[in-house]
Amino acid sequence: MIIVTGGAGFIGSNLVAGLEEAGCRDIVICDAMGEDDKWRNILKHEIRDIVHPNNIFVFLDEYADDIEMIFHLGAISDTTETDTDLVMHNNFSLSRELWRWCYEHKVRFLYASSYSTYGDGQSEVGFSDDDSPEMLAKLRPLNPYGWSKHLF
């Protein structure tokens, strides 16, 4: 089984499509469907289940032996969200818990970061793939979303 957090969003649903195209048929989406039209993004996909983020750890524990990999794209991605506690809890703390769960259960974990970690790109760093601690320390995210992705 492959789990895609944020799987009903634009990028996540396209990842699900790519996985299906590659022959994967045991896909679970973890996403908060809410009141918007995200359900339309997954309408054409044959997925095993949709799990709300509040229930993900119960689901993981129940199906631990079946899980091959987690693609972690789920996040509050609204760069105008001003509730920093909410963004940090969802994007940093829960990501860390999910990574720990994967580590403890020997499940592959792929984390999607964001260009927002760079900030405005005007520092001496610019946009770089250098992930050394020295270079990462120079990044200056501009909002809670970018900061939450940078910290992880």
Per-range role (PLM):
Residues 2-24:
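N-terminal Rossmann NAD(P)H-binding glycine-rich loop of SDR-like oxidoreductase domains
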Residues 5, 30, 70-74, 109-115:
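SDR active-site strand-loop-helix element
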Residues 24, 104-108:
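A short helix->loop->beta-strand "cap" motif at the edges of active sites that frequently abuts
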Residues 28-56:
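Glycine-rich phosphate-binding loop and adjoining beta1-alpha1-beta2 segment
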Residues 44, 53-90, 119:
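NAD(P)H-binding glycine-rich loop region in Rossmannoid oxidoreductase-like domains
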Residues 75-85, 114-143:
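Active-site "gating" loop of Rossmann-like NAD(P)-dependent oxidoreductase/epimerase domains
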Residues 90-95, 102, 110, 148-149:
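Short alpha-helix in the Rossmann-fold core of NAD(P)-dependent oxidoreductases
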Residues 104, 139-152:
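Active-site Tyr-X1-5-Lys
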